[in-house]
Amino acid sequence: MEDAPDSAGRDGIDAEREKQSGIEAMIHTNINVVYLITDGVPEHDVTFLGRHATKLWKVFNGSSSIGIVSAGSCRLGVIRGAFDNLVLSKLYREGSFGVITKSGGLSNEIIWICSQFADGITTAIGIGGDAYPGTDYVSYLDMFENAPQTKAVDLVGEMGGDLAERAAEWYGARERRGADRAERTPAGPEHGR
């Protein structure tokens, strides 16, 4: 990383060097998202990188992730595969669905479904199938909640872990926050209600 120009990407990092490479990437002020596709990274390294990213206000996605794609903008990783699939999934323009998955195959399937039977996706994120992903569902749900173009989020989990339970708790708290705001908003036509 030290010798790479600011605009250069870096790939081909093996599991043993992933922790150090992740730390080096997070040091750079112009890098806000660190994405790692590598399988077989020790869990303690992944949890360290996740905590380190949080301290630095960065996003660490992975490891063992198929990638991230923002329609009409960029793709990190191999999500949706070959260029032909990107075009067939209409990823050249933004839709209104967010996608968060642990499964690479299911992320590709959900993107395809959203593009064929709806207006497509805003962003799709494969967080990786490992037991301890660098970023959990809740962090990405917060991101989508603050993205006005995203009207719905399709969250697809896998067996094991408590990520889905934490996402359900987040959603329940979100509903309560919405009810609290509605109670504080004055009623009547002069207030838009």
Predicted segments, located by residue:
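Catalytic-core regions of core metabolic enzymes
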Residues: M1-R193
